Regions:
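Short beta-strand-to-loop capping motifs
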Residues: 472-474
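Gly/Thr-rich phosphate-binding beta-strand-loop-beta motif of the actin/hexokinase/Hsp70
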Residues: 1-28, 121, 125-156, 207-211
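Short, non-transmembrane amphipathic alpha-helical segments
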Residues: 480-499
Length: 510
């Protein structure tokens, strides 16, 4: 096992993330620490970081170094962004940090920061074309990508902290000040005509983007607590921002979802997003919980493990990671996945579902047993909970709930259990009918490998004028599997309106 520490010293805050990489290539985060620094506010008239900035940064880095020691980190990757990059004495601070903590900070350029943030987004959000904005305390990185490849990028010295200081918007933002802020930002954005991409979504990275999403979720009483891949319309944003502009600092401190440490810089940060919507013509915003730190991890991981730095299929990548974390023996799960996909493909006339549901079924099948890690008893419920909360990229929030319900329901967990616990507001009655169909297919597939020996190695699902058919090819007589599948025949008839005729192939047919 290898332990990787990633440190990001930004203009507003500093972060330490420690992850484990296991021998089988699986990885997960085991520690996360955030410290507010506000370096963009600790710069004098000569563009020098003050002694207060030095002391607070060094104390934070000492704390990070101590935690790296506690977790026995094998590798530490530490970067500094806009505040230190733009300061006249940034290199001096880097030297002091190295001398007093032993950690070598690397000041990365704006273009490098943009690229690394892009890696964090493109490997975790399933969007082909879009514009990423990484809005920090002292800068905003903008990246245009199409077909998942970068076409343009730029780093602008406009952030939530330095814009707050420049226009004194810590408490309120009167109309005339907002006009000045907007003119200042738009005049800089207009220098990059490639930003005008009507129809492409804006993908937000950074604390301001996450906070805005959290506030909107609370206002809408959104049933999930996930921020990553949460999307909303530009109209929703404008309504939110118009309300926010009419608040003072004390009022904002009472807003659900807005932390007190960000309440003084949210006006400036939100103004930047408002100007980006105007400059790009975007109609939709997507929130990314992954950015610079995740990009640094993917960059390191790809080089060490000789895998593409940009995953071709992010759902498959993340699904395999979850499987490798919790399923040491994968033969059974992979075998029933093969069986259930054969049924889905052959019985399309019966289930009538779009091909998109195939990947949800595949994910549920591969991960249906991971709950055994917690306890064999009620493991279907545990599997469903783990799938619901796992870092499965490439699925919408709704798709992840459906996948979790398929995995749990196939093994007898009641529909009402999920309705009561799993964000029932996200799913319609039609969704539950779909889940029932897919859970049934998964139950059939699992019954065909009940002994987990792959005795039934090939199946031929079919449909004739009267019934659905399922011919089984096996080594020997799979008596236990033949008994188990009988228990699902009434469920099949109730769901699809036809009987399922199961036939074991003869030796001559093998």
């Amino acid at each position: 096992m290898q332990r990787i520490a990633i440190i990001d010293i930004g203009s507003n805050s500093a972060r330490l993330v420690i992850s484990h990489i296991y021998k089988n290539g699986a990885y997960n985060m085991v520690y996360n620490q955030k410290e507010a620094l506000r370096l963009s506010q600790k710069v004098d008239e000569k563009n020098m970081l003050t002694e207060v900035a030095f002391s607070s940064t060094i104390e934070t880095m000492k704390s990070f170094a101590y935690m790296c020691k506690i977790y026995q980190a094998d590798k530490t990757i530490a970067v500094a962004t806009a505040a230190i990059r733009n300061a006249a004495n940034g290199a001096e601070l880097v030297a002091r940090v190295a001398e007093e903590t032993g950690i070598q900070l690397h000041i990365i350029s704006g273009n490098t920061e943009a690229y690394i943030s892009y890696l964090g987004v493109i490997n975790t959000i399933n969007v082909k074309d879009g514009i990423i904005f990484d809005l920090g305390g002292g800068s905003t990185e903008l990246i245009l990508f199409k077909n998942r490849k970068i076409l343009e990028s730029v780093s602008l010295p406009i952030g939530a902290v330095n814009t707050t200081s420049m226009f004194n918007t810590r408490n309120v933002m009167p109309a005339n000040v907002f006009s000045d802020v907007s003119f200042f930002i738009i005049s800089r954005l207009e220098k990059y005509p490639w930003l005008k991409q009507n129809g492409l979504p804006l993908i937000g990275v950074g604390g301001t983007a996450r906070t805005v999403a959290k506030i909107i979720q609370r206002e809408k009483k959104y049933p999930a607590t996930k921020i990553h891949n949460y999307s909303y319309t530009a109209q929703t944003y404008c309504s939110f921002f118009n309300r926010l502009r009419n608040t003072n600092l004390e009022q904002r401190k009472k807003i659900s979802g807005l932390s007190s440490e960000r309440s003084d810089i949210i006006l400036a940060g939100s103004s930047i997003i408002s100007c980006l919507l105007e400059a790009t013509g975007a109609k939709k915003l997507i929130t990314s919980g992954c950015g610079l730190r995740e990009g640094l991890f993917f960059d390191y991981y790809s080089k060490e493990n000789h895998v593409p730095i940009i995953a071709k299929d992010i759902l498959k990548m993340s699904r395999e990671n979850v499987l490798n974390l919790y399923e040491p023996d994968q033969q059974h799960s992979r075998h029933i996945t093969h069986l259930v996909l054969s049924m889905f493909d052959a019985w399309g006339e019966l289930h009538g579902l779009r091909k998109n549901y195939r990947r949800l079924l595949e994910t549920a099948a591969l991960l249906h047993d991971i709950g055994i890690t917690i306890n064999f008893y009620s493991h279907a419920r545990h599997s469903a909970y783990m799938i619901l909360n796992a870092k499965l990229f490439g699925l919408t929030h709704k798709e992840q709930v459906i996948t979790a319900a398929i995995a749990g329901w196939h093994n007898g967990v009641s529909k009402n259990y999920f309705k009561d616990r799993f964000y029932k507001e996200l799913l319609s009655d039609a969704n539950w009918k779909t889940i029932n169909k897919l859970a049934l297919l998964l139950a059939l597939a699992e019954s065909l490998d009940y002994t987990e020996t792959s005795q039934i190695h090939v199946i031929e699902p079919g449909i004739n004028k009267k019934n659905a058919t399922l011919k089984l090819y096996a080594q020997g007589i799979p008596s236990i599997e033949m008994h188990q599948i009988q228990e699902h025949l009434s469920w099949f008839k109730k769901t699809f309106g036809v009987e399922l005729k199961v036939q074991l192939a003869t030796a001559a047919e093998e």
